Amino acid sequence: MREHYAETLKIFFSQKVSKYRNKLGVTQEEMADRLMMSCRSYSDLDNGVSCCGGLTLALFLTTICPEPAAFLEELKEAFDSCKVNTI
């Protein structure tokens, strides 16, 4: 069951981080700098290859995401639907 949540977070975060990067009009390299990570790691996040860690999520919410509460509410909804699909 935990794997479902991890996959949901990976997809959700990938979509959000890519959306905000495009909205800000910055490159993957610039986003990597803002999130204090390597370009390769950021590229993997942006493309849904890997999931974010706690520090990356915290940096995203505090430095990039304009509405962290809305982001977390949407993530909660995604997790809630994950619960329904695994029952």
Residue ranges: model-predicted function:
Residues 2, 70-87:
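Short, charged recognition helix plus adjacent turn
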Residues 25-43:
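Short alpha-helical DNA-recognition segment
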Residues 16, 27, 53-56:
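Residues that mark the N-terminal boundary/hinge immediately upstream of a DNA-recognition element
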Residues 55-73:
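DNA major-groove recognition helix of helix-turn-helix/homeodomain DNA-binding modules
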Residues 1-23:
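A short, Lys/Arg-rich alpha-helix, primarily the initiator
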